[in-house]
Amino acid sequence: MDHFFQSERFEDSYCTYPNLYQQFAQQIQDGGTIVELGSWKGQSASVMCVELFNQQKNKVRFFTVDTWEGSEGEGHKEDKWIKEGKLYDKFKENLQDVENYYIPLKMTTEQASHHFSDGSCDIVFIDADHTYEGVKKDIKLWKNKIRKGGTLAGHDYDPAGKSWAEVKKAVDESFGNDVMPVIGGCWMVQR
């Protein structure tokens, strides 16, 4: 299946890391668990779903976690889909071609964390609340959910600290020298 994450259906382009998601899909064993915190309109989720389909990894459980209500910090409240109360519908519409490759959890990241036991996740990708407090909270809630050898990663990490400074501060304080900046404005930590 061809990728469609660059199609106009997504309206805005936040997925700057398709290669990272492709790498995750290649590395994960069939039957593994991936959790994406913050899925917005599904652009990055579409990359993962297409990769899982193309690699015939039908047993990977890929969870997308979002309230689909937007957040103040990113200016999402002005988005037309949020104003109409239809962002979740837009997300599902955008991913209709790969609907069997993801499991949506319409809840907060904290609520979702209670659905996963420690060591049960292979990969958790944090891209939800971009405030310092929000990122710290998500790291605290999810870092122990990662199995040994698994990956905790996230988006909007600028090593120079020029943009999304609160994300960088929270990640650096949590992991220090263990943080690996990766292409596409992402960060990663191996457990």
Q: Where do the language-model regions lie?
A:
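S-adenosylmethionine/decaboxylated-SAM
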Residues: 2-191
